[in-house]
């Protein structure tokens, strides 16, 4: 059984040599949604999350909502094991793949074929697994002979196709996503959406951050509402979305 458990988790980002930066700190506070606390004359701390607790189990399809800077990305990175809490504890049991940045690990100067291996290794695949999936990834990308060219020579659309084909080739127990992934021309978008539904359907725990009410209604059975680093509401999808979007219209 897969399990994620957060117990009173807080995440702080220290900023040193911050004296005489009151305007910058204020702008940063607005941009991140976090709280700024001055520890000393030369140390300011931005609190991205504060006292967040939750338990996610098999079958949970979690939607994550909140304004820009509410702490969604910070929470996604904690759930992915990228950030370690500065206070509290995070327990993650199950193979986890994060699709927050699907181009993480890609080398612009390496060929498409080389980058399939680099990105796959970054996601935790073993060499044997990469070998087994390589041809299917290459075929799904639709890049053909361009796979022998450096990644930097690709158009932005081609780069995203390669990154998408590689990143979605896994079948994790826990899937963390920042928005729904879809890219390319109409033919590729159709194939990409089909693959995304297959990926979401096969995972045991899904966490999807999105601003789309329709997307969250379609894919999630529970929604978490973050505000200024705090968990404001946690409940059934319809109930939380009605409260959130109703509040946004006021």
Question: Model-flagged regions — what are they?
Answer:
Residues 3-15, 58-63, 67-122:
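ABC ATPase nucleotide-binding domain signature region
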Residues 25-35, 117, 129-146:
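Conserved ABC ATPase "signature" region
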Residues 189-201:
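Helical segment within the ABC ATPase nucleotide-binding domain
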Residues 218-225:
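Conserved catalytic segment of ABC-fold P-loop ATPases
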Residues 228-229, 244:
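Conserved ABC ATPase "signature" C-loop
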Residues 234-235:
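ABC ATPase "signature
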